[in-house]
Amino acid sequence: MNPVIKKFQFGQSTVTLETGRIARQASGAVLVTVDDDVSVLVTVVGAKQADAGKGFFPLSVHYQEKTYAAGKIPGGFFKREGRPSEKETLTSRLIDRPIRPLFPEGFMNEVQVVCTVVSTSKKIDPDIAAMIGTSAALAISGIPFDGPVGAARVAFHESTGYLLNPTYEQLQASSLDMVVAGTSEAVLMVESEAKELTEDQMLGAVLFAHDEFQVVINAIKELAAEAAKPTWDWQPKPEATALLGAIRAEFGDAISQAYTITVKADRYARLGELKDQVVAKLAVEEGSPSAGEVKAAFGEIEYRTVRENIVNGKPRIDGRDTRTVRPLNIEVGVLPKTHGSALFTRGETQALVVATLGTARDAQLLDTLEGEKKDPFMLHYNFPPFSVGECGRMGGAGRREIGHGRLARRSVQAMLPGADVFPYTIRVVSEITESNGSSSMASVCGASLALMDAGVPMKAPVAGIAMGLVKEGEKFAILTDILGDEDHLGDMDFKVAGTSKGVTALQMDIKIKGITEEIMEIALGQALEARLNILGQMNQIIGQSRNELSANAPTMIAMKIDTDKIRDVIGKGGATIRAICEETKASIDIEDDGSIKIFGESKEAAEAARQRVLGITAEAEIGKIYLGKVERIVDFGAFVNILPGKDGLVHISMLSDARVEKVTDILKEGEEVEVLVLDVDNRGRIKLSIKDVAAAKASGV
């Protein structure tokens, strides 16, 4: 096959799609190049036969950043790439979410997508190129896929409006970082963080992106017209109409009744009993449907029952209407020895959230293609199996936990104080202790509460809510605060977080076509109503950050020294600063501009370290009055300590206007006395006076 190349202009960049030159044994392979900044090789392979033992669609997406792409060699002992980074995991999820709904219902053949960043200039994020490449590779692979999909990143500035596919530098000054993906007809996925933008501004960004990425879809269609392989001859299994009818006729009412049981565990127990009865009755003899087929049909009846009830205006599974938030129970300060804690319960979803403050040394070190950087804010989300009443694997964070943690982080990050105001490293951990829908948004609420309980000066409280959608024909219902079952059986998962003034994060995943601007607008308005309701209840418990940090949190003292003194504080080979830290039990961070942050487990430890630093760096100011302590008396005067490690001499002639025969007639060792600095010679010797203090005070010194 000869290489096929398509070029098109996409915002401020030229994008090139090339196939037929690299990875030709894959079902589909496309090399995406954006200007000369980014190149991503995307391959798609589909298994020709489905694995009969799998009852789900085995799609896997692997996004990987090779260090050679940025001209680097991996650090560490093993000089090769290791396990996926958090960025790679999040981007894999970002690519997966818009393509998964476009494979046909019932398609169970394994599909693997591999996106490899092979070149980057560190100007733009390669994720959009990877999403475009995935869509193009699927379009030419022959695998059944209802694409192509377009994708775009959007930034927003109050003065200039929306900006398509911004650079890293442009994102720094933006109030919005949004990624949108969809088909020519509809939006399928939104992932964003914002600085309190309005619902209209967020919706405008979604629609702007959808309009702009049509050029991507058209280019992929042109590529597929020249390079696509024949579409697989795959047909879905015919619907088991007779089996569905038999289950509905005999068990339909019982299934519908089971979905009025409000307690999840009781409802699941009843549905389990009914499923066993259905299998026992309909999968009994040879020639009848298998147990797997009966269970699948039972699940389809469940799906239709819940959806029909909702669109026809009947009460939801737990008896609520479409706009009501589940009952809230909010507590703060629940863990006595932590820096800040909150227990946030919404219905059968509960998060125990803990905030911990640390020093700059506790910041997360990130080794990315763009270079090393430190992240002073972490939010970790844990979802143990007991939260849903199950036994399960315990271990490191999975893709879902990383994704939910990042969404919660995006939601609260814009409301954190700057490093100049609050130079602590912050770690928030959300432990999901119960789950029945929207645990990530419970984490947002809990994180805001725990941070305020810890005394972190938040700009405003943040709350989050998960919305759902059920659409049958022209009928649709938008659901506030969805349950786990409503998420599973619905057509949309729409999470919105923000303050009373605006949106800080928006995540949307849509499983069907035909989500209109009207539906998104209604969902955003309904989410605002729910968010304000939750914020009102949160504010009754704690409406603003505590005035003081927890007594368990480290004490921080900030100071600045002359840059010439940095070497003195550090000492030869770091000996001086190491000795200060060991002896005072404090930690000291020094910046190149002379800024110093001292962290101590107690106020006393931090102050002791500060005094040690002052003793090394402080200089006596000529003409300034100090309260000093007489350290030593000699025949010709007295040595007075005015600063840590700084003694000056009060000559006997400078003790009093009257003649002084003996210094001890005026001063005693250990006595505190006010002195005026007269001079500091080029050897650092300080000349002091007692008799001139009164005159200096009178003149306003």
Swiss-Prot record:
CDD domains: KH-I_PNPase, RNase_PH_PNPase_1, RNase_PH_PNPase_2, S1_PNPase. It catalyses: RNA(n+1) + phosphate = RNA(n) + a ribonucleoside 5'-diphosphate. Mg(2+) binds at D487, D493. Keywords: Cytoplasm, Magnesium, Metal-binding, Nucleotidyltransferase, RNA-binding, Transferase. InterPro entries: ExoRNase_PH_dom1 (IPR001247), ExoRNase_PH_dom2 (IPR015847), ExoRNase_PH_dom2_sf (IPR036345), KH_dom (IPR004087), KH_dom_type_1 (IPR004088), KH_dom_type_1_sf (IPR036612), NA-bd_OB-fold (IPR012340), PNPase (IPR012162). Residues 623-691 form the S1 motif domain. It is found in: Cytoplasm. PROSITE patterns: KH_TYPE_1, S1. Its EC number is 2.7.7.8. HAMAP family: PNPase (MF_01595). Involved in mRNA degradation. Catalyzes the phosphorolysis of single-stranded polyribonucleotides processively in the 3'- to 5'-direction. This is Polyribonucleotide nucleotidyltransferase.
